[in-house]
Amino acid sequence: MSRRVVRQSKFRHVFGQAAKADQAYEDIRVSKVTWDSSFCAVNPKFLAIIVEAGGGGAFIVLPLAKTGRVDKNYPLVTGHTAPVLDIDWCPHNDNVIASASDDTTIMVWQIPDYTPMRNITEPIITLEGHSKRVGILSWHPTARNVLLSAGGDNVIIIWNVGTGEVLLSLDDMHPDVIHSVCWNSNGSLLATTCKDKTLRIIDPRKGQVVAEQARPHEGARPLRAVFTADGKLLSTGFSRMSERQLALWDPNNFEEPVALQEMDTSNGVLLPFYDPDSSIVYLCGKGDSSIRYFEITDEPPFVHYLNTFSSKEPQRGMGFMPKRGLDVSKCEIARFYKLHERKCEPIIMTVPRKSDLFQDDLYPDTPGPEPALEADEWLSGQDAEPVLISLRDGYVPPKHRELRVTKRNILDVRPPSGPRRSQSASDAPLSQQHTLETLLEEIKALRERVQAQEQRITALENMLCELVDGTD
């Protein structure tokens, strides 16, 4: 299996290791909803997990440092009236997360740096435009406040979250349920997979399918696809005999795959997590207890098997940390957050190196939190690659930044071509007032808690004095 190429790779010795028990997150009731999303999203500040909740949908957000047992009364993010199906952190604001639900809505939330005293129930904005459940979310990689959603109505909507407007609605390109959507590196193209077995490349601003492959995989199970750094596509699917496959495609020649890897026979859909800095793709299947990883190169045979991380427990979902959230001092090149039935376990991928110096070859400049474009610039046809940062001195997440939703002058906005959207939550120049009220409530609750603790301390001191007096 191309042993010569793998042997020369700097990633040939990459190994995975589960974090110690005290670094896991325990007693989390992970959602049991049947849906092929990762159920987990992570960034350098927070870990978010879709959880079981009565009376609607919810997810929990934990600071990364809050490991160990999670209190059963820990505040949740609630507001959806049906199960949450997907969550995605904004790449340009580590305190903003979007959630999609079976209730047909998308909600965008501001997460405070401090631990809230009660459930977070008020989103910054609610986006309504789909007629059926919304199961896929993806933020634009370079444009500020641009969010994509895909629903069971076979429609893709691209929103400007900063104004609540529909920028684009792609409603006639998929005849059946959409299984996955992925942006390319500069957000000029989309790759989609659909229940009709077709892999499509779409120019969303032109509203055109620019290339397609009718049956990239012969099997009946769902497909997934992601762009590589050089514009090729990686797809996962099934053979006619139900063997799981990984294929590499050149969009300029969609007739045959550039490379095809066949693996085991299993029902679990393979979720591909691609790292453009190392050109490694990690394959995680729901129900699997392993993570396979391959290096993608521009020399035959193009897809090189590296190794498999195996554990005893099957995974219910998986989160993938952005490169800026890794520990470069330990030569960590990837970190996953594996969901079990009632816990989340970090899994660290490391390249063994003897030197303690910064490893330039492992850590090229990587996308940072600053957007390269505004939403209007992207919509007008501009493209820009991500704004890169160096990890040489490590990465420190910026302080809390509030997402402001502004309502435009109706006379300055052309009627949207896509579905209409709810104004209920976006009529929020009141957001500042709401933030102030929330902070005042938090301060009041903290004062009450301090007062109660002071009373408890006084009572304990009195009891101690009585015990001391009784022994004298």
Swiss-Prot record:
Coiled-coil features, chain-numbered ranges: 430-464
Membrane-spanning residues: none
Keyword Transmembrane recorded: no
Keyword Repeat included in the entry's annotation: yes
Record's keyword terms, sorted: Coiled coil, Repeat, WD repeat
WD repeat windows: 23-64, 72-111, 122-161, 165-204, 210-251, 256-296
Superkingdom per UniProt: Eukaryota
A Pfam family it matches: WD40_4
BP terms from Gene Ontology: actin filament organization; cell migration
Entry's Gene Ontology molecular function annotations: actin filament binding
Region described as Disordered: spans on this chain: 407-433
Extent of Polar residues compositional bias: 420-433
InterPro entries: Coronin (IPR015505), DUF1899 (IPR015048), WD40/YVTN_repeat-like_dom_sf (IPR015943), WD40_repeat_CS (IPR019775), WD40_repeat_dom_sf (IPR036322), WD40_rpt (IPR001680)
Designated name of the protein: Coronin-6
Taxonomic placement: Eukaryota, Metazoa, Chordata, Craniata, Vertebrata
Gene that this sequence comes from: CORO6
